């Protein structure tokens, strides 16, 4: 029991292993794609005789089509491009003839080089980091991710508010795409930014309540020093309101400033008669100061709103004073050094209703602004961030007259990957305009706004700008110059099928393709072969730009390849060679029989001599018999004999050969061709042949079978229709093979008939002379009968073949009348998956085997059927053609009453022998098959005899055992 279980388990293990191997093999096959090309049923012009081929290839920007497996640190493997296969040509699998027109359309986007941080960037300049402003601490250039690379974060640059100068964020060439974003204002939290120069993460405290911040916090201030925060009314603060003292002197008063001091003293000794100017002790509003900036608050109370006008981004705190000349302290004299200390901004700062004490209830308290934030109060953009384009990329502080303030792009243009899982922005885009300019190169520059007259070293904070850039961007095969001439042009070369330009070591002359704005173009092949393509890029620096390239083009091909003509390629050369040889041999026989224009009679026998002798003998014999009364003659017989003598004597004429060659020979040998041509409606001649070809009606069907790629694809596509498709394929293939065999038999019959006719005409002088005597008359009659038989035998045969060929062509189009594409045809799915996994995975294939399939067939929606009636009709017609060849031979034999071998029999034998010789190369000829069959029968007989002998021995043994058992029982 245990051993049986082990056997069962062993069998199951073997089966499981085989299944694994089969699935692995099918998986590899399913991964094979030669493109998604299609063979169209009709060409674009609607005419036949051409293969209308469409194909689509993927042209990689890096020109690398081979992957290798790389082991990752976590133990997993990853497929990466083979580092040794960049910059290679791709075989499009499109075969063209010389001067054949190829139409194509290039669709897609590629980036043909990688962008790197420029010098004098937002974080470092050549002044602060000489010679290394664009290099990291390892002296390596810093690459910028591409715009379309959603899986890579942008490069972050820390923008310090202390740097009040224009700096570069991107070097732009024509058609470059750039995506500039700003990191948010980190409120009440820490900020973390990748420092791409140091290769580390920088984390700083960005919580509110501080008056200075690191640049990565997303806020900055240009304010420092002191500013007025309140106003206080100070009594008796200064002396003002100058006036003259009242005079009480009887004799009148004098003015102190107009007299000497001793005079005033004397005048005042008796009474106060010398008066002076006096001042009142006046109050004034004095300033109360605080330090700038005020501590940042997340509620936005000290934050500027976004504006695109610089006047809205600056408050001149130095101009805000509680009273006039408050910054000039009183000197205690009368009058004071200034005479105006009236309130200035007291109401705005302290409030209208506050009239004493310290006042700080004015509107100013609500309008104090010190901070600019990256999220931009109001949400329109990062406040105070300005940008410009600069052609030189130089660092400068000058501000243009018109400032461009950065704004957030619309919500619909914000990349979804720039948000976290909670929908909060990690980066917010402020610039996404492709660089399209007549200028070859320019730099995108940014700076934080601040007055140029202000000392920026006292500024605090800053922003973090993030950059993605797609450099050397091209669309739809268009090309133009950047630092490399004509970068992005799609190039092609045409090489022979056995040649690989990537390994041949040859030097080629690539042709560039000029496309329109939609990527459409066409060209004429300069030679025959396969088209190879690649995208032109800078090959220098060890193919660095190819290695940095990304993206691909879809190149859609459409071309019409003229199908080779069976008539021109096969029949015309065959008939040209055969007819020339046979006609030459026949005329040579005729000429040798009559020694036509021969100066040396040793190489020929002049049959005219024998004809003369026979004719003389005939006249003498018949005349003697008539004179002696042995022969009776009437008028009818006399006329017949004179006609015979005249016909035979005509052969003695020296112009006999010209007559036969110029009139009779061509008329008789071409008789069949003319009748066949009239029946089929096809011409006997083409532009390339001078020998008549009656098989022109076969050109369409045979050219399609032998030379049409579309037909081969249509036939193979039957295999994609499932099990029924295999049956369809076998039946259709057999029908096509029968037609081919029938065609070859018909050609053989025609050749034999033509050769027999030519030979019979060549020996005509001999048989015509047999007309004279009654005992040789039957030879002449048979000669005439066979000549007529061989003349009409091809005509009768072709009459039926022509009709059946047309029917076969029609029904073949019914069966295979569809366009064909190379695509997924046989999906491999896990059986019983619905009982294990959710029903949603029931119809999901693991992989798919690609094959030729009819246009429009979808493996997911079921197989496409073929009308079986048409296939049956196709087979019936094919068998009818095959049988008609032999039937036509028997029909002609009865019509002409000519016994003996016919051209049909001879041609059949010839085609049979040729076929057997061909099959013998693979061991499938009749003799080999017969030998295999006989040996198999012999082995089978030997096996049967062995089994019979073993059975007899077994019966004898059992009988002996039974006898021994009976004897033991009796005892």
Swiss-Prot record:
GO CC terms of this entry? plasma membrane
Q: Residues annotated as region Disordered?
A: 127-146, 933-971
Basic and acidic residues compositional bias, start-end? 945-954
Q: Does the keyword Kinase apply?
A: no
Please classify the protein's predominant subcellular localization into one broad category. membrane
What are the subcellular locations of this protein? Cell membrane
TM ranges are: 611-631, 721-741, 753-773, 795-815, 832-852, 865-885
Q: How does it sit in the membrane?
A: Multi-pass membrane protein
Hey, what's the signal peptide range on this chain?
1-24
Which family does the record claim for this protein?
Belongs to the TrbL/VirB6 family.
Q: What is this protein called?
A: Uncharacterized protein RT0030
The organism named in the record is Rickettsia typhi (strain ATCC VR-144 / Wilmington)
């Amino acid at each position: 029991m245990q051993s049986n279980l082990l056997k069962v388990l062993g069998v199951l293990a073997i089966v499981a292993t085989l299944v694994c191997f089969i699935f692995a093999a099918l998986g590899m096959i399913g991964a094979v794609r030669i493109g998604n090309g299609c063979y169209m049923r009709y060409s674009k012009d609607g005419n036949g005789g051409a293969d209308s081929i469409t194909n689509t290839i993927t042209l990689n920007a890096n020109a690398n089509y081979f992957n290798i497996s790389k082991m990752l640190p976590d133990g997993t493997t990853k497929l990466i491009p083979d580092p040794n296969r960049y910059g290679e040509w791709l075989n499009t699998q499109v075969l063209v003839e010389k001067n054949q027109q190829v139409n194509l359309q290039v669709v897609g986007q590629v980036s043909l080089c990688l962008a790197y941080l420029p010098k004098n960037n937002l974080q470092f300049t050549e002044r602060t980091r000489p010679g290394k402003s664009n290099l990291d601490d390892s002296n390596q250039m810093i690459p910028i991710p591409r715009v379309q690379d959603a899986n890579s974060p942008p490069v972050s640059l820390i923008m310090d508010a202390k740097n009040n100068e224009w700096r570069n964020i991107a070097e732009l060439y024509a058609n470059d795409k750039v995506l500039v974003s700003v990191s948010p204002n980190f409120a009440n939290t820490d900020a973390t930014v990748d420092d791409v120069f140091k290769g580390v993460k920088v984390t700083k405290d960005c919580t509110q309540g501080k008056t200075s911040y690191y640049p990565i916090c997303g806020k900055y201030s240009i304010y420092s020093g002191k500013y007025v925060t309140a106003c206080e009314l100070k009594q008796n603060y200064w002396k003002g309101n100058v006036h003259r003292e009242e005079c009480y002197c009887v004799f009148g008063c004098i003015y102190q400033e107009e007299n000497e001091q001793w005079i005033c003293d004397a005048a005042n000794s008796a009474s106060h008669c010398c008066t002076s100017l006096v001042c009142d002790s006046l109050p004034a509003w004095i300033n109360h100061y605080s330090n700038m900036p005020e501590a940042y608050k997340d509620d936005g109370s000290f934050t500027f709103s976004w504006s695109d006008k610089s006047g809205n981004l600056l408050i001149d705190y130095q101009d805000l004073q509680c009273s006039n000349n408050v910054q000039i302290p009183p000197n205690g004299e009368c009058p004071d050094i200034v005479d105006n200390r009236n309130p200035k901004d007291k109401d705005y700062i302290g409030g209208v209703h506050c009239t004493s004490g310290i006042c700080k209830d004015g509107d100013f308290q609500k309008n104090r602004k010190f901070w600019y934030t990256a999220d931009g109060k109001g949400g329109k953009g990062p406040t105070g961030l300005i940008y410009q384009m600069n052609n030189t990329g130089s660092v400068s502080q000058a501000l243009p007259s018109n400032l461009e303030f950065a704004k957030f792009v619309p919500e619909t243009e914000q990349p979804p990957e720039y948000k976290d899982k909670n929908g909060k922005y990690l980066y917010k885009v402020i610039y996404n305009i492709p660089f399209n300019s007549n200028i070859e190169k320019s730099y995108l520059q940014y700076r934080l706004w601040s007055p140029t007259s202000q000392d920026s070293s006292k500024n605090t904070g800053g922003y973090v700008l993030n950059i993605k850039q797609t450099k050397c961007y091209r669309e739809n095969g268009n090309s133009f110059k950047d630092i490399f001439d004509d970068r992005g042009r799609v190039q092609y070369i045409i090489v022979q099928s056995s040649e690989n330009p990537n390994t041949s070591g040859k030097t080629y002359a690539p042709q560039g393709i000029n496309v329109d704005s939609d990527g459409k173009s066409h060209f004429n092949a300069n030679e025959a072969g396969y088209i190879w393509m690649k995208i032109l890029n800078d090959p220098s620096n060890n193919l660095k730009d190819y290695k940095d390239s990304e993206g691909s083009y879809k190149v859609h091909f459409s071309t019409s390849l003229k199908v080779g003509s069976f008539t021109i390629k096969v029949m015309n050369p065959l008939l040209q060679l055969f007819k020339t040889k046979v006609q030459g041999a026949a005329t040579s026989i005729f000429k040798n029989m009559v020694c036509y224009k021969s100066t040396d009679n040793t190489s020929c026998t002049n049959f005219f001599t024998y004809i003369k002798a026979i004719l003389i003998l005939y006249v003498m014999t018949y005349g003697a018999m008539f004179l002696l009364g042995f022969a009776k003659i009437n008028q009818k017989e006399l006329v017949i004999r004179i006609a015979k003598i005249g016909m035979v004597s005509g052969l003695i004429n020296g112009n006999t050969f010209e007559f036969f060659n110029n009139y009779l020979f061509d008329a008789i040998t071409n008789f069949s061709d003319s009748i066949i041509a009239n029946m089929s409606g096809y011409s006997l001649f083409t532009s390339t042949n001078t020998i008549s070809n009656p098989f022109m009606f076969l050109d369409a069907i045979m050219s399609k079978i032998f030379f049409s790629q579309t037909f081969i694809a249509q036939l193979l596509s039957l295999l994609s229709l499932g099990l029924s498709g295999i049956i369809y394929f076998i039946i259709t293939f057999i029908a096509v093979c029968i037609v081919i065999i029938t065609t070859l038999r018909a050609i053989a019959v025609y050749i034999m008939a033509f050769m027999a006719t030519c030979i019979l005409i060549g020996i005509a002088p001999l048989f015509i002379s047999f007309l004279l005597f009654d005992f040789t008359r039957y030879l002449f009659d048979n000669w005439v009968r066979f000549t007529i038989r061989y003349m009409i035998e091809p005509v009768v045969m072709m009459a039926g073949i022509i009709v059946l060929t047309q029917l076969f062509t029609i029904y073949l189009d019914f069966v295979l009348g569809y366009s064909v594409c190379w695509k997924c045809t046989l999906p491999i799915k896990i059986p019983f998956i619905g009982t294990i996994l959710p029903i949603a995975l029931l119809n999901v294939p693991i992989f798919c085997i690609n094959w030729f399939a009819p246009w429009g067939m979808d493996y997911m929606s079921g197989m496409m059927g073929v009308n079986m009636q048409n296939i049956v009709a196709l087979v019936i017609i094919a068998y009818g053609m095959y049988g008609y060849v032999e039937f036509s031979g028997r029909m002609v034999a009865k019509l002409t009453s000519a016994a003996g071998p016919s051209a049909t029999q001879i041609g059949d034998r010839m085609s049979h022998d040729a076929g057997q010789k061909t099959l013998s190369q693979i061991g499938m000829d009749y003799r080999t098959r017969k030998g295999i069959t006989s040996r198999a029968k012999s082995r089978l007989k030997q096996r049967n005899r062995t089994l019979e002998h073993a059975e007899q021995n077994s019966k004898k043994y059992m009988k002996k055992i039974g006898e021994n058992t009976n004897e033991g029982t009796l005892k």
